[in-house]
């Protein structure tokens, strides 16, 4: 299976938000669970990486915790890839609320026509490491990189044979760049909730308990 797995990363310090962002709620449901429902339209296996796995015991997701602790996003990518069953794995952060399924399909097409170890979007001189695909064969490379004492995700990505989607091409799918929005503060979340579309939740298991 080439594109069967998606990973939602629920870790991070959330300093600016003031609380753990995996607890973001809309209509008394965890936002992360809404992500899982949307991604299930394209992926057979939805994996949540969280160091509080008990939160998701009643959900349909596969829930895992970092195997290599305190290494930032690379630790989450590492365990997500190890748990996945497909050649390529889609990664999303839990604070990215605007999933664009058409863009995910487009990235899959890019990797079908031009295989690489990752498919990542450029934004000016920056890159967007999530809302991206990574090859499952990166597990050993991540272990070597972290074992050598390195932590920087961006330095690691520069070492890969990567298919980069240009900002211009990505804006065909999201002219305002909303599909890469991160909810970093309470103000970000409240603004998004006021402006965003109404969200419907269907899985009772996703009801927030706190």
Swiss-Prot record:
Q: Which GO terms describe its cellular component?
A: cytoplasm
Task: Note the CDD domains from the entry.
Answer: MobA (cd02503)
User: Could you give a single Gene Ontology term from the biological process aspect?
Assistant: Mo-molybdopterin cofactor biosynthetic process
Q: Which InterPro entries match?
A: MobA-like_NTP_Trfase, Molybde_CF_guanTrfase, Nucleotide-diphossugar_trans
Q: Which cofactors does the annotated protein need, by name? A: Mg(2+)
Give the binding site residues for Mg(2+): 95
Domain remarks: The N-terminal domain determines nucleotide recognition and specific binding, while the C-terminal domain determines the specific binding to the target protein.
Cite the PANTHER family for this sequence.
Answer: MOLYBDENUM COFACTOR GUANYLYLTRANSFERASE (PTHR19136:SF81)
Q: How does it assemble?
A: Monomer.
Task: Provide the protein name.
Answer: Molybdenum cofactor guanylyltransferase
Q: Which gene encodes it?
A: mobA
